[in-house]
Amino acid sequence: KRPNPATAKRLRRNARPRMGDAWAWAGRRIRPATPDGLPVATARSFNRAPGTVRITGGTIKGRKLDVPAGDGVRPTTDRARETLFNVLTNRFRKPGGSSVLAGARVLDAFAGTGAMGLEAWSRGADFVAFVEAQSTHFATLCDNLRAAKLPTDAGTALRNHEGLKTTDRSIDIIIADPPYEQGQALLTALLARQSALWHADTLLVWEHPRGGGTEAGFDGWEPVHQT
């Protein structure tokens, strides 16, 4: 027996994936309680897929990016990245209501393929610094930036975070997806060593293993969104 049109429409709507299927909850941005308090958004890891990944929104939506071969490569899936950037776009706003990504200076701190930073640029970021230490991954990153036709004044690829000192302005959004086995230690060191680049409204997005030690947090930062 075929359902009537109203029932069929309701079934299709209910079958669609919801933001809640990927995120436990999304909170509003909380203003720091102290002058040196800085906001942090944390995101759990999602399943990974090898091969190629695609930009999911913005001016270069659909652009394919290569993924370097190797056991240590774990690019975030397209669906998970789309969910994360939907949260950034819809939940975090500048005074006046524009997206936090609009005109932002972004750090893709452990860039890999560069998908996170390119997604940010595609969706309105003004400048992205991509940092990738592993030589094979760095070569793939540079190939992906060229394929995406990233203008030279809209981004730079670096082999280490010390190169960030050559940037002449502070960072608005840090996107960090470090190696899981030493992720919190690497990120803690980065936040301390490059502290001159962060300002009072810098937003940190950290992807970490499910159930992986976020309780300790980071000195000077407070959570405003967690899944």
Spell out what each predicted region is.
Residues 1-227:
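Class I S-adenosyl-L-methionine-dependent methyltransferase catalytic core
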